[in-house]
Amino acid sequence: MISKIDKNKVRLKRHARVRSNLSGTAQKPRLNVYRSNKHIYAQIIDDTKGVTLVQASTQDKDFENETGSKVELSSKVGEAIAKKAADKGITEIVFDRGGYLYHGRVKALADAARENGLQF
């Protein structure tokens, strides 16, 4: 019998492997991305303190009336997180794609964040 591969389990193993070498500091915090079937979430984290500095997602009040494809909304979340980070004085980050492939919604979020001033 053929067993079905649990894609989320594989993603979590990949994410744990990457996180062992990747950490955010106060000077260069970590931009973490989580993707569900319907929404995308991004947060900038200082791992030394264990504190979320800035967050943005498609469930924020700013996105209540937004329409468009999931890729377009992801790029708008990237813009929002970059603007919120700039308000807090954060310009350099470490990008944590959360074990997802750098493609589609994750890539759109990262590109929009770069275009709006975040360096990684």
From Swiss-Prot:
GO molecular function: 5S rRNA binding; structural constituent of ribosome
Keywords associated with the record: Ribonucleoprotein, Ribosomal protein, RNA-binding, rRNA-binding
InterPro entries: Ribosomal_uL18_bac-type, Ribosomal_uL18_bac/euk
S-S bridge residues: none
Coiled coil: none
CDD domains attached to this UniProt entry: Ribosomal_L18_L5e
GO CC annotations, alphabetized: cytosolic large ribosomal subunit
One GO BP annotation of this record: translation
Keyword RNA-binding part of the UniProt annotation: yes
Similarity remark: Belongs to the universal ribosomal protein uL18 family.
PANTHER family per UniProt: 39S RIBOSOMAL PROTEIN L18, MITOCHONDRIAL, LARGE RIBOSOMAL SUBUNIT PROTEIN UL18M
Record text on subunit structure and interactions: Part of the 50S ribosomal subunit; part of the 5S rRNA/L5/L18/L25 subcomplex. Contacts the 5S and 23S rRNAs.
Task performed by this protein: This is one of the proteins that bind and probably mediate the attachment of the 5S RNA into the large ribosomal subunit, where it forms part of the central protuberance.
Name of the featured protein: Large ribosomal subunit protein uL18
Organism: Staphylococcus carnosus (strain TM300)
